């Protein structure tokens, strides 16, 4: 398989040490969990990124407005086509179609623009987002509308809203 390295079973011949326990496998594999990340224009992704120390910066509507502006900036730049998003107090979920470039470039632009503008607005410096992000490629047999509804239901599951559509910091391309 491309992107994966399997150890040579002959002792001493592998640059990757052989695993001796399941716990060791988890610890050793974790730095490469997203090694196989693959981005392709035209694919739809669910992306999640979290603030440093899970700081609830987006409990403030003014900060949410800055992040929403950054999401729209990435779309206006032709990099993404947003289908749905929800801004939770300490993270964002984003359903989008990649239009140009890579996921890494897309997320880098979103994070750098929102960080710069938010730090300026808050009169602070430093990292706003944790390193990395979680991505899920939406398969062709998965319903985009169902994915969007799942994302929009996050505030309900977190106890921030009673029903989908009530939370003010969410948006969807389709009617609810």
Feature names for model-found ranges:
Residues 1-176:
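Short catalytic/metal-binding and nucleic-acid-binding patches
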């Amino acid at each position: 398989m491309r992107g994966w390295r399997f150890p040579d079973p002959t002792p001493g011949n592998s640059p990757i040490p052989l695993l001796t326990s399941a716990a060791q496998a988890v610890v050793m594999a974790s730095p490469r969990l997203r090694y196989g990340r693959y981005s392709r224009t035209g694919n739809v992704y669910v992306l999640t990124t979290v603030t440093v120390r899970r700081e609830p910066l987006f409990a403030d509507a003014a900060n949410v407005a800055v992040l929403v502006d950054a999401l729209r900036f990435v779309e206006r730049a032709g990099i993404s086509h947003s289908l749905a998003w929800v801004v939770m107090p300490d993270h964002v979920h984003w359903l989008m179609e990649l239009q140009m470039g890579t996921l890494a470039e897309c997320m880098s632009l979103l994070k750098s623009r929102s960080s710069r503008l938010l730090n300026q607005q808050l009169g602070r410096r430093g990292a706003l987002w944790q390193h990395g992000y979680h991505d899920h490629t939406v398969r062709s047999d998965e319903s985009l509308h169902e994915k969007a509804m799942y994302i929009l239901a996050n505030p309900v599951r977190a106890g921030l809203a009673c029903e989908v559509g009530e939370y003010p910091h969410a948006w969807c391309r389709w009617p609810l």
